[in-house]
Amino acid sequence: MKNKWGRRIGVFALAAISSALMFSTNAITAKAADNEWTYSYTGGVQSWTVPYNGKYMLEVWGAQGGNDTHNSGGLGGYGCGKIALNEGDVLYIVIGGTNGYNGGGTSTDNHDAYGQMNIYGGGASHIATTNRGVLANYVSNKSEVLIVAGGGGGAGFSSEGVYRGGYGGSGGGTNGGNGGSMGEDNSIPGAGGAQNDGYAFGRGASLGGYYAGPGGGGWYGGKSGYNRSGGGGGSGYVNTGKLTDGSMANGVRLGNGYVKITALHTHTYTSKITTNPTCTKDGIRTYTCTGSATDAACGHQYTEIIPKLNHDCSVVVPLGTKGYEVPGRPGYFYTRKCS
């Protein structure tokens, strides 16, 4: 278990996140740092158990839609929000795939004149408080979904030497982007999903009329169009009843989807410790301090919660200081709370 109280991070701007993380990865679940956990595409449900009470940032990226020979599928969307969680809570994570996993539409029964086959809408990525599998299974339990990033729409099919299929719409974001037309009057692009409208909850449309591309998965999936147009991207979603500071963006993710969870703890010290701690087996250290005119917080007993790790319980706090750093973790400090 990680340090329960000693976390300090900075939250960087959405634009920086979006640009820095526009990459593709097929890696399985990994732990990126002591205060963050990352999840990549696996084709199934993954889970994360909250290690300690506190506030966390949830970030999700949807998958890119499939490419045609001449045009690209829409990039996956992005969403983020903050949530207070308790130790032992479990969140369930599903990462969208470029193969349509988690709601992307399919077009496996068609191919273009160049042999391009199997264009899919990108799958959505979501985090929920229960395990019901793919997003579409929450249609009667939407309140259990915390956050969604839409998948990009698939490109329309091309015709050799004559027509080029339209590009896929970007994944959401509040709304998914519309697909692109192939330029003919009767080419109708697929519409992107919205907050309360789209092809279907959790699912993008499969192949539309006359070689149109499929829709991306999302809160509401993108629609397919007509005559080689691109499919619409799926919409994203932030559950504002449970998350704060929500934000979404369109079209920032190449390849499969992605999820990152970051601890947002920040702790400061308000008083000096004037006695060395006494260690106890249960991991609680107790401090006392004497009152003074310059240290109003003194006169109380302080306790320090020691994480269940192999830290040396004999390490003492230097007298007259505000505490000591976590062994081997410069810049990270144990937090003391007034009892």
Stretches found by the model and what they are:
Residues 12-24:
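Bacterial N-terminal signal peptides
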Residues 73-178:
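Secretome/extracellular-domain signature
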Residues 33-67, 140-141:
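GGW-centered surface loops in extracellular recognition modules
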Residues 41-46, 52-56, 89, 280-283, ...:
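Short tyrosine-centred short linear motifs in exposed loops/low-complexity segments
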Residues 1-13:
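Bacterial N-terminal signal peptides that target proteins for export
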Residues 21-34:
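Sec-dependent signal peptide cleavage junction
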Residues 264-339:
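Extracellular modular ligand-binding repeats in secreted and cell-surface proteins
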Residues 241-264:
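A recurrent domain-boundary module in secreted/ectodomain proteins
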